[in-house]
Amino acid sequence: MAKKVVALIKLALPAGKANPAPPVGPALGQHGVNIMAFCKEYNAKTSDQAGMVIPVEISVFEDRSFTFVLKTPPASVLIRKAAGIEKGSAQPNNQKVGSISRDQLKEIAQTKMPDLNANDIDAAMNIVEGTARNMGVTIND
């Protein structure tokens, strides 16, 4: 018989740096999950992506066991890294803070493809381009 899911927890944690301190501890602790076991497993799976923020979806079962699914890093993080900027623009319409090429945009779209609601790479590129535009990042052809 399948185990019953009692909670679905979504967190965005730095790759390879999960620890029992907030936000991990309180989120998992209230469901009775072994926090250290999660931290060790998460850090092992994300150690190759150091410096990125990796969203994770944790399913907690009634016997207090858990499984988790790693998502792709947020588009804004990938765009910031590609453009070499610290943060997006406060006024994206007036103040441009950086630029990325079409090739970089396509690369980001391919990375994000599994998590996007897009049928092909062009649709994914449009989604990522919209995010870039809202951050004050221009796309060069």
Curated annotation (Swiss-Prot):
Pfam families: Ribosomal_L11 (PF00298), Ribosomal_L11_N (PF03946)
Domain of life per record: Bacteria
Post-translational modification (record): One or more lysine residues are methylated.
Keyword terms of this UniProt record: Methylation, Ribonucleoprotein, Ribosomal protein, RNA-binding, rRNA-binding
GO CC annotation terms, alphabetical: cytosolic large ribosomal subunit
InterPro entries: Ribosomal_uL11, Ribosomal_uL11_bac-typ, Ribosomal_uL11_C, Ribosomal_uL11_C_sf, Ribosomal_uL11_CS, Ribosomal_uL11_N, Ribosomal_uL11_N_sf
CDD domains reported for this sequence: Ribosomal_L11
Gene Ontology process terms (BP): translation
PANTHER family named in the record: 60S RIBOSOMAL PROTEIN L12 (PTHR11661), LARGE RIBOSOMAL SUBUNIT PROTEIN UL11M (PTHR11661:SF1)
Functional description taken from the UniProt entry: Forms part of the ribosomal stalk which helps the ribosome interact with GTP-bound translation factors.
Subunit structure: Part of the ribosomal stalk of the 50S ribosomal subunit. Interacts with L10 and the large rRNA to form the base of the stalk. L10 forms an elongated spine to which L12 dimers bind in a sequential fashion forming a multimeric L10(L12)X complex.
Protein name: Large ribosomal subunit protein uL11
